[in-house]
Amino acid sequence: MNIYTFDFDEIESQEDFYRDFSQTFGLAKDKVRDLDSLWDVLMNDVLPLPLEIEFVHLGEKTRRRFGALILLFDEAEEELEGHLRFNVRH
């Protein structure tokens, strides 16, 4: 299982995350532009599953700012039943 790490010391906004996510997985720039399109990418066999995604350097303030993104990945992990692992580390 490949691990993909997103460092929130370098990601300041959701738009930054969408850009980094798209670059990491070789997606077109406009493929991931909001939470709905990110969900579609996760659910529609676009990514090389199985995989693990981890968010690092997420302090409390940053967790609150990116709460919707974290919840989306938590739900995706449940939906994909073992094909996606998601972790958050400080």
Swiss-Prot record:
- What stretch or stretches form a coiled coil here? none
SS bond partners:
none
Note the SUPFAM superfamilies from the entry: Barstar-related
The organism's superkingdom is given as Bacteria
User: Which InterPro entries does the entry link to?
Assistant: Barstar, Barstar-like_sf
Q: What family does the Swiss-Prot or TrEMBL record give for this protein?
A: Belongs to the barstar family.
Name assigned to this protein: Uncharacterized protein YhcO
Q: What would be the name of the gene that encodes this protein?
A: yhcO
